[in-house]
Amino acid sequence: MAISQQRKDELIKEYRVHETDTGSPEVQIAVLTAEITALNEHLREHKKDHHSRRGLLKMVGRRRHLLNYLRSKDIQRYRELIKSLGIRR
């Protein structure tokens, strides 16, 4: 269900704003999107796993708040990010 540390490091390198960046909204949104995708695959197979479903909903909400923040601060970075991640908004 969770993404591997190696995959997380790849996402951080791809979406970071500067060399030591790990906490920018872009990085957080990219990592959350990967975790949401992995959890979605798990829930397709395990339909009655309501505990994981609640975790998924919390992650989606956290990502939504980060996307709203990024959109309010820098609309261009927001548009580039949702296009590269393939998020419908």
From Swiss-Prot:
The protein's UniProt keywords, in alphabetical order, are: Ribonucleoprotein, Ribosomal protein, RNA-binding, rRNA-binding
Q: Which SMART domains match?
A: Ribosomal_S15
The yes or no answer to whether the keyword RNA-binding is present is: yes
Which GO terms label this protein's molecular function in UniProt?
Answer: rRNA binding; structural constituent of ribosome
Gene3D superfamilies assigned: 6.10.250.3130, S15/NS1, RNA-binding
Q: Which GO terms describe its biological process?
A: translation
Q: Which SUPFAM superfamilies match?
A: S15/NS1 RNA-binding domain
Q: Which GO terms describe its cellular component?
A: cytosolic small ribosomal subunit
The keyword Transferase appears for this protein? no
Protein family (similarity comment): Belongs to the universal ribosomal protein uS15 family.
The family database entries (PANTHER family) matched by this protein are listed as:
RIBOSOMAL PROTEIN S15, BACTERIAL AND ORGANELLAR, SMALL RIBOSOMAL SUBUNIT PROTEIN US15M
This molecule's function is given as: One of the primary rRNA binding proteins, it binds directly to 16S rRNA where it helps nucleate assembly of the platform of the 30S subunit by binding and bridging several RNA helices of the 16S rRNA.
Q: What name does UniProt use for this protein? A: Small ribosomal subunit protein uS15
Q: Which organism is it from?
A: Staphylococcus epidermidis (strain ATCC 35984 / DSM 28319 / BCRC 17069 / CCUG 31568 / BM 3577 / RP62A)
